[in-house]
Design a protein with these regions (language model features):
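Structural motif
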Residues: 2-4, 34, 93, 122
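Generic enzyme active-site microenvironment
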Residues: 5, 37-38, 71, 123-125, ...
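Extended substrate/RNA-proximal surfaces in nucleic-acid metabolism proteins
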Residues: 41-151, 206-211
Length: 213
């Protein structure tokens, strides 16, 4: 089974406890095929070029053992720096978080801003079905039209993940939509790594023939 984990934090994040190397080596030992590092943009700040180059070094270092991707988790409460679309042009992808929070930037404003990013973009730990109801939108069409993928966050902190595991109606909607779906552990320290949940989510997506980003 092809296994990805595209949401991990390191010491580049204020709440990360491990080095990128430790996260990557744990992924190798856990049988992960693709590991994504996605530290918080508001912690990295002006050191974004340093962060990017560090992850590029890790890509080369571990190239014969695992595929490493350079991502970034971007907070939306409040609206983040307008320079980020240019600053992340070379990144593999970005994850936007907290759009379903009442303090987040306006969703329509977000969609306009998202179009400035040239790298892949996804929604982290977001109940997209609830978000669609909140704005009265066909959220599936919105994500598809704006080339945004969705994340299944296996950290155990978000109920939408557990609902999707057993909700065949929502599974069918996502499958028929063709929207790519990623899997992310949202790891902040290795003691919390949930390998079994990562494998289960990846297996479900493959059984449903739902594409990865």
């Amino acid at each position: 089974m092809y296994t990805v984990d595209l949401h991990n934090h390191t010491k580049f994040s204020y709440d990360g406890s491990n080095t990128p190397e430790e996260i990557i080596e744990n992924a190798i030992n856990s049988g992960i095929d693709v590991i994504g590092i996605t530290d918080h943009q508001f912690t990295i700040g002006d050191n974004l070029p340093v962060y990017y180059e560090y992850i590029q070094h890790c890509k080369i270092k571990y190239a014969d053992k695992i595929k490493v991707l350079c991502g970034l988790e971007i907070g939306t409460r409040p609206a983040p720096e307008q320079s980020l679309p240019i600053a992340t042009r070379q990144f593999d992808y970005v994850l936007f978080e907290c759009l379903d929070d009442s303090r987040a930037m306006d969703f329509y404003e977000f969609l306009e801003w998202r179009r400035q990013f040239v790298c892949k973009a996804g929604l982290a730990h977001t109940d997209i079905f609830a978000l669609g109801e909140r704005y009265g939108l066909d959220i599936i069409k919105v994500l598809r039209d704006n080339d945004i993928f969705w994340e299944l966050n296996t950290s155990g902190n978000y109920n939408y993940y557990y609902d999707f595991l057993t909700n065949t109606k929502k599974q069918r909607i996502i499958k028929e939509s063709g929207i790519p779906v990623s899997v992310g552990s949202d790891t902040h320290y290795l003691a919390e790594y949930r390998k079994k949940q990562i494998r289960r989510a990846n297996q479900l997506l493959q059984e449903l023939n739902i594409p990865l980003p």
